[in-house]
Amino acid sequence: MTVSANPMLLTDEEFEKYRYIMDQPADNAAFAILNFVDHSQVYRILGGLQKNSDKVSFDDIKKLSYEVKSDADPKQVEFLINYMKKSIDDYFNDRTHFQFTPEETECLKRAAIFFNTHMTECTLSLAVRSLLKQYAAFKSTNVLMYTQLLPKYPYRRIISTMQFVMDVMDIKAFEPEGYGIIAIQKLRLVHALIRNRIEVNTLNKVPGAMWNDEWGKPINQQDMIFAVHTFSLEVIYGLIASGEKISDAEIQDYYYAWHLIGKALGVRDELNPSEFYIGYQVQNRIYKKEFIKDNPNGPALAEPLIKFMIEVLPLAKRKGVLGLVKLFNDKKDYDPIFKDILHLELDEASKFYTTMYNATDNLRHILIKIKYFFLPKAKRSDYFKDLARNEHRFFNSIIDIAKTWTDSHFRIADAFGVEAAEENEKESKKMPMWKRAVKYFFPNAEVK
């Protein structure tokens, strides 16, 4: 591993400049797409990319372009096709950030095994700690409110986030049959498309809203490292708060894996520490200036997440979900973050639900250890990998039940704005959770 960058050495003025720096390589590809003859068709074709081995079919794009723009100048269409083809080729074929050293590859695998063998805890920590802390940061969340997508379709972003994390934390995420590389490239491009659309004011937004330059640029470098740290630091601290015992080596492996993912997402090296303890300091530096009481975004974003958790968790009511929020967070944050900023009254939390969760979690760990103890030594090395794959499949099934679209992995559609979401909702109207469960496990069943 190389010597870690240390953004803590930057002055406040230098650090703040990163709120005005974006991601030029991804922005170039987004600009080419948005200036294409019919970019909605390009979105659909790019949306078909899932596996790392998938390729963009430019023949399909060319055919669609002439169909939708038959009255256009053929030379102009040809120029735009070639320009966009080069831009997208340059973007998707540039995999330098995924040329990992043997040491980095092993670290990514160890982090994936850790995530998947603790998937229940990691997923809950992601939901009730990582995302809620994201929503408490005022400037970073303005883009979520401005685009309207999260307020109108809150579950889509929550589930898409979970899908992304599962794609990049799969044990085979960065192998040809995996989904991690494409998921990262698509998310990076989604950010760039949103930035470009805000810059030219073509994005569906809250009527009358204007982007305030004091917020910085949309999805800027500081926002990006902040978000990456909520997926690494906050997940780890959530597990520790809930009572999990995690070694220093596991903590550093998990953090370093997300350092590599952050780099691939376009975070600049000088803002992307490779050491956990430096990352912790950087994240708290951002929290101190972004966590403010007068944050109208926080409650508007936090409440749909709580409702989502009530819907997907078995036998959970509001008090039970608030109990999980308490379990996975630190007592010092209960009032200043959850009460004052997000308007979540954790005093209403139920201890019964968290007690039941802890009991079943402890029992699961005991059973895992017993089974491992009685395994032949020759099979022990693959035991946790198999366990991770099984838990990964289980959570994928939960996500598939909860969502209202058919894509199996991280999608690019939400970069299009609310029109795509509305179109998608019409194709698959939301059913109650129990009906979706029936349809998932029994596809031929008639459920009205």
Regions picked out by a protein language model, each given a short descriptive name:
Residues 1-448:
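Mature, function-bearing regions of proteins
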